[in-house]
Amino acid sequence: MKISIITVCFNAVGVIEKTILSVISQTYNDVEYIIIDGGSTDGTLDIVKKYENYIAYWISEPDSGIYNAMNKGVKYATGLYCNFMNAGDFFINEKVLENIFTSNRNEDLISGIAQIPQGFWYPPEEKNISLFYFFKKGFCHQATFIKRQLMEEYPYDEDLKISADLLFFI
């Protein structure tokens, strides 16, 4: 089953290579890597071009914000699931995707543990999550895989500058 990993970035020369290497070093083979750049001018594109043989699709053009870039990434994705591994983010090791997707999955959303500067972010254990949970904790993009069909059906609200992802999850 194909997984689409989408990186959105803008002027991320200091962190983009770590993200790219994290994605392309995954041992799971059916990965489509997409990079949506907002028109970087700092050398980010030189790094992207260095790895373009590993990238299924990349584009560099101005966008109207992060949610516009994320929606654009979903538009080009062909995988069953999408994950956003934005510039500066990385998988904890090279077996993350293999550990998740070796067995056939059919959940609409898969969320795992994420290491963040404050410690660890843990996904909810419940199948039915309350609205209160979203306002308190939310979901961590880097540790969440969402069926592409859902992302196409319910795109991020590009009029919002923050929290459009919260609205999506609700």
Which stretches of residues belong to each language-model region?
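Short aromatic/hydrophobic "clamp" motif used to bind/position activated sugar donors
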Residues: 82
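N-proximal low-complexity "stem/linker" segments adjacent to membrane-targeting elements
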Residues: 1-25
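Conserved nucleotide-sugar donor-binding catalytic segment
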Residues: 112, 122-170
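Acidic helix N-cap motif at the loop->helix transition within catalytic regions
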Residues: 14-17, 42-50
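Short beta-strand/loop segment that forms part of the nucleotide-sugar
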Residues: 30-39, 59-62
